[in-house]
Amino acid sequence: MKINYQELANNIKLWAKELGFQKVGICDVDLSQHEAALEQWLEAGYHGSMDWMARHGVMRARPDELHPGTIRVISARMDYLPPKAGFASNLKDPNQAYISRYALGRDYHKLIRNQLKKLGQKIEEEVEQLGYRPFVDSAPILERPLAEKAGLGWTGKHSLLLDKNAGSWFFLGELLVDIPLPVDTPVENQCGKCTACISSCPTNAILENGVIDARRCISYLTIENSGIIPEEFRSLMGNRIYGCDDCQLVCPWNREAEITQQADFHRRSSLGNSDLISLFSWDESTFLKNMEGSAIRRIGHIQWLRNLSIAMGNAPHSEAIISALQDRLGLDENLDIHIQWAIKQQSLVITSNRKEQRLIRIIEKGLPRDA
């Protein structure tokens, strides 16, 4: 059976759109140019406690070792920006918890993996014999360099992939295949001299163009770090209890980003009320029930309370907050450290964070639809 691979590649992109992906590109598996930078980043310890990154090392840059026989990677993008994102209104109210917008709906891993699997099955029907494997970011693979190579966008200074139409509000997934599909052309970097993301990072986690010290990043601190959050970062976290979107919010390319068509990525009803005290009152069973099917669930109840306690410490003085914090003392040793800090903070006069106020003004001016 003779296969027209160019025609097949065109069809793959059509099928992917039918499965809910907004854009698809194809590349080869050579990521050798990224291996040295990856090793340097790991040696510097910028990955923090994410030991799995160091364990897999340069294998992350070798897709053909993850799935032997792989010669092409189909990289796919799925937009997640929810309607009525309410960025500015949320950040302006210190008594409301801020949750990164990618996590407001259902966990994307399973959904995207399932759609990639369906894409693989569709391709298999056409070529009769196909070796393939879907990956979403939980797997040890350098998905951003692959997506960049496949023409899905360019890497911003915040290390996220950027597309002219979608900004950076999207998930990535990969389908590794063993057929010689024609590859796509990378796009030109459009960031220019802009450094908005670097100057707006609350904790100065963006060290230089594309280099992130995860140990300083609020997303890492609230999600990947299960231990004690260093005191130097707590007040800078504000009301961000799960992730951080600041570097995306100031990016000019995100001003016209499209709203997701995937209803599963819309805000879940259990997060309709993000009042800090209300969320802090959830016991473990309530947390597990309300976060079923959510990416937030995997951090666990104690880490959820830890993050909330910091936000409560950063909120305006309130006897109700102090009482709620005191009621949780004794539940967990590490949690107590953060609660005691928060109680102490509540007794101080909280001054406005100038960088955060600037961020809110930028959102209201540049992202009025999503403010």
From Swiss-Prot:
Question: Sorted alphabetically, which SUPFAM superfamilies does this protein's record hold?
Answer: 4Fe-4S ferredoxins (SSF54862)
Molecular function in Gene Ontology: 4 iron, 4 sulfur cluster binding; epoxyqueuosine reductase activity; metal ion binding
Q: Residues in the active site?
A: D137
Q: Is the 4Fe-4S keyword given for this protein?
A: yes
Q: Which cofactor does it need?
A: cob(II)alamin; [4Fe-4S] cluster
* Keyword hit for Transmembrane: no
- Going by the record, the broad EC class of this enzyme is oxidoreductase
Catalytic reaction annotation: epoxyqueuosine(34) in tRNA + AH2 = queuosine(34) in tRNA + A + H2O
Per the UniProt entry, what is one GO biological process?
tRNA modification
Name the keywords, alphabetized.
4Fe-4S, Cytoplasm, Iron, Iron-sulfur, Metal-binding, Oxidoreductase, Queuosine biosynthesis, tRNA processing
Name of the featured protein:
Epoxyqueuosine reductase
Q: Which organism is it from?
A: Aliivibrio fischeri (strain ATCC 700601 / ES114)
Q: Which lineage?
A: Bacteria, Pseudomonadati, Pseudomonadota, Gammaproteobacteria, Vibrionales
